[in-house]
Amino acid sequence: MIATILTATDGSEPAAVAERYAASLAARLRARLQGISIVEDRLAKGFADDGLGLAPPSMEALAAYLKSRSDLALRRLGERARAESVEFHSEALQGIADDLVVERAQQADLVVLGRDGQHARFRSGLVGSTADGILRKTAKAALVVPQGAQLSGPLLLAFDGSPGARTGAQIAVYLATRLGEPIHVFVDSKDKGRAVARFDEVRGLVGSLPVPVREISSTLGRPDVKIVDSAREVRAGVIVMGAFGRNRITDYFIGSNASAVVRTSPIAVLVAR
């Protein structure tokens, strides 16, 4: 089901965490790893005549630095893949980062991204601009890795009955089987009747697994907060959830619960579509 994993790296420490996670996941799933590093146009071509009569600086040295950084990032990723005995291919590109990742992701089954980018320390937001753009635009499942995340422990499946959550359940079954980890199913149970129906549905989707399946419900608090809290409590290695809730409005933005979980979780989050 997951034969090719795509990961993008900018060489930063947050990206290095995602590199390790992607290489380890590819090894355990026996998947190929495709690495890309992108020299962004806004950096390589960001200085131009702005009408003030001030000539822009020479870009040759900056372009050479950015290209060298991109090549070194891919070399580091390749070394990690080889250490895990993973088949690895790489590509260095120049352009608009999120658009190029989305384009290359069409040939992959899963995209793995660092949550924070190279400039994380200079901003107040909690998701890097490139990762945010990819999550908004891609039609592929995306795994967002925060700093400190480890590929160990059970899976937490947040299930709300949406199409994305059903896809997430299928991915969770695949991952749990291949990783040999249990699944904890979280359902927001403020509406008891709906909660019962959702647990019944997810039991049918999960089927008869060779790993334990446990159920968690919550009647209090915001679902995104309870999902993260539950994942912490069970020491989950990954949270799996749909990109959109049942009240989906637009194709362009991921749902509010998924967005909040991605922003705040200390655990990797797989967003399914």
Where in this protein do the model-derived segments appear?
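Small/aliphatic-rich secondary-structure junction motif
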Residues: M1-P57, E84-V86, K137, Q150-S218, ...
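Gly/Ser-rich helix-loop-strand patches that form or flank binding pockets
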Residues: A15, E19, A26-R28, S90, ...
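Aromatic/hydrophobic pocket-lining residues that form π-stacking "cages" and hydrophobic walls in ligand
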Residues: A18, A22, L77, V101, ...
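Short, well-ordered secondary-structure micro-motifs
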Residues: G46, V102-E103, R123-S124, L155, ...
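A short acidic, glycine-rich active-site loop
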Residues: A55-D71
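A structural motif corresponding to the C-terminal end of an alpha-helix
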Residues: A73-F88, L209
